[in-house]
UniProtKB/Swiss-Prot annotation:
Underlying gene: SERPINB6
Keywords associated with the record: Acetylation, Cytoplasm, Phosphoprotein, Protease inhibitor, Serine protease inhibitor
Name of the molecule in the record: Serpin B6
Pfam families the record matches: Serpin
Similarity-based family: Belongs to the serpin family. Ov-serpin subfamily.
Length: 376
């Protein structure tokens, strides 16, 4: 799984840098479900198409496709397991034009490794019906949070292959922010601009560290059950978030976020309440990273999927996150706060300017989500 965690982590940071080229924009996506969806397509790719995909997804480090697909099988089983104290719904499906005659071996592998189906639709003569069908499937899989994945006109009678990838997550904090402490504060979008934000506050014991080389504090906020953590990277006010993003490699990310190397200390945390819903057309992003052949008819080689001449027509990724006060240990935590207020100096972690955040699965080190909060 480590090789896969490295591949997915490298891809995650490359995507973060590409999607975040515009400094002022918020970014939120799920690198794990994106890798997962593309790995499924990679199973059916051959030749140069496969080589480009392997490079963009950082699979070339891992020496071979088979291990990758088995790795995803274990990862998905682990992350989507029932009985967890968080809700995570990933929806992956390939929708293909029904006249293309997809190989049963490919369909079986999708099911076996990716818990995903290949569904055939009639894009040629029932394009709008196909679009609505895809949208209702996604809405059902994401508890209604993601309703209109494909906008009108986004598929047409020439569409051959649509890769749909949506993900919904809801987790409660291991320790809750008391709603009574939430108040309107100013968020410094840039040196010259401020916006109002609902700022949550809590004083408690968390793992945190300071990375001197990028002048950045890192704080770990665990979700209930401690299977998932939110890792927040907050640069000093004198340091641009861009600098942090430039320096970030997967190796450094692992080194900087090692829980066993962090101090557990009492800290005053101020974090904005926010909701992000981002949608990305991934074709241009993936092309800019070097995966060009897959989207071009005549160049794309998906002969492991179908004998028909195929190319990827559409890769859409939409994700939704809401960060608020909710948690479970409210009563105990609140009482404790009152007693600690007058204690010794407590370090502050005040996220009132742009920061990066990652939601990570502790057991597999998988980065489930990746985001940048630049502006309320």
């Amino acid at each position: 799984m480590d090789v896969l965690a490295e591949a997915n982590g490298t891809f995650a940071l490359n995507l973060l840098k590409t999607l975040g080229k515009d400094n002022s924009k918020n970014v939120f996506f799920s690198p794990m479900s994106m890798s997962c969806a593309l790995a499924m397509v990679y199973m059916g790719a051959k030749g140069n198409t496969a080589a480009q995909m392997a490079q963009v997804l950082s699979f070339n480090k891992s020496g071979g496709g088979g291990d990758i697909h088995q790795g995803f099988q274990s990862l998905l089983t682990e992350v989507n397991k029932t009985g967890t104290q968080y809700l995570l719904r990933t929806a992956n499906r390939l929708f293909g034009e029904k006249s293309c005659d997809f190989l049963s071996s490919f369909r079986d592998s999708c099911q076996k490794f990716y818990q995903a189906e290949m569904e055939e639709l009639d894009f040629i003569s029932a394009v709008e019906k196909s679009r609505k069908h895809i949208n209702s499937w996604v809405a059902e899989k994401t508890e209604g949070k993601i309703a209109e994945l494909l906008s009108p006109g986004s598929v047409d009678p020439l569409t051959r292959l649509v890769l749909v990838n949506a993900v919904y997550f809801k987790g409660n904090w291991n320790e809750q922010f008391d709603k009574e402490n939430t108040e309107e504060r100013r968020f410094k979008v840039s040196k010259n601009e401020e916006k109002p934000v609902q700022m949550m506050f809590m004083q408690s014991t968390f793992r945190k560290t300071y990375i001197g080389e990028i002048f950045t504090q890192i704080l770990v906020l665990p979700y209930v059950g401690k299977e998932l953590n939110m890792i927040i990277m907050l640069p000093d006010e004198t340091t641009d978030l861009r600098t942090v993003e430039k320096e970030l490699t997967y190796e450094k990310f692992v080194e900087w976020t090692r829980l066993d190397m962090m101090d557990e200390e009492k800290v005053e945390v101020s974090l904005p309440r926010f909701k992000l819903e981002e949608s990305y057309d991934m074709e241009s992003v993936l092309c800019s990273l070097g995966m060009t052949d897959a989207f071009e008819l005549g160049k794309a080689d998906f002969s492991g999927m179908s004998k028909a001449d195929l190319c990827l027509s559409k890769v859409v990724h939409k994700s939704f996150v809401e960060v608020n006060e909710e948690g479970t240990e409210a009563a105990a935590a609140t009482a404790a706060i009152m007693m600690m207020r007058c204690a010794r100096f407590v370090p502050r972690f005040c996220a009132d300017h742009p920061f990066l955040f990652f939601i990570q699965h502790s057991k597999t080190n998988g980065v489930l989500f990746c985001g940048r909060f630049s502006s309320p």
